[in-house]
Amino acid sequence: MKKKAIVCALALALAMLTACGESSSASESKKDETPKADRETIYQVSLLQGLTLGDYNGSVSVKELKEKGDTGIGTFEGVNGELIMVDGTVYRAKSDGSIETAPDDETIPFANVTFFDTDEKEDISGVSSIADLKKLLDEKVEKLGKNQFYMVRVDGTFKKMHARSELKQEKPYKPLAEALKTDQREFSWDNIEGTVVALYCPQYMKDLNAAGWHLHFVSKDKKYGGHVLELDVDKAELKIDCTQGFNMQLPDTEMFPTLDLTKDQSDDIKKVETKN
């Protein structure tokens, strides 16, 4: 009887260990199935060319976007303001240049974000125009490699910041260049502290985005911001994140499947990216 009891006890213990092992394996398997965020990837929502053709319908929520990065730029459904993501928070620069935090359930038709890791940094000063800043950044790109993606932060004081946002559009949507002719609003601030977030796309991306630099700004006090048209850097810290990966989420909007994306939109993109 004693031997039987010992055997039964051992069998019960073995069964419990086996069950625990299976439970642990299942837990580990579930953990392995959960994808880790790739910090070396630029995540893009839709094509810029889809936005410029007038597909302002959101396809990804703010909450979902924050799972893909902590730094980036974009816009909101109906181009309802300029999107600036800094340190994991998504801000909207409204049509009057003021800033608000975007709610998690708001949807996004176009954006680029990444998890920012500083690969290079330096202090800069006396960069008196956006052209001079782009020239400085282009020199960095030439050294590091022009066929990669770059997300940049410029944190500091600006003698001048000139930016734009736009009025929310209503359906039926017009192409972006046409909408901005009447609904773009511009603002200027002097001696303002804040952060410029800039994205660089290689030349081969010209059919999916705008090749070169695209800059947005949010003030340090999170009161003002927009799409940067001109600037004058007093003193700032420049930080560069070099990124090799690219992941684009095509939208599931009603409009996107029938858009003529073969059309050359380079002129329209230049119009919407620069000061008219």
Predicted stretch roles:
Residues 135-199, 206-208:
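Long, positively charged binding patches that form subdomain-scale interaction surfaces
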Residues 1-5:
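Positively charged n-region of N-terminal signal peptides that target proteins for export
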Residues 46-111:
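N-terminal low-complexity or amphipathic/hydrophobic leaders
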Residues 93-140, 144:
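A glycine-rich, hydrophobic loop/mini-helix early in the fold
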Residues 16-19:
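C-terminal motif of bacterial Sec signal peptides marking the signal peptidase cleavage site
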Residues 21-23:
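Bacterial signal peptide processing site
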Residues 55-59, 81-84, 243-276:
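Intrinsically disordered, low-complexity terminal/linker regions enriched in Pro/Ser/Gly
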Residues 219-261:
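A hydrophobic, small-residue-rich beta->alpha segment in the mid-to-C-terminal subdomain
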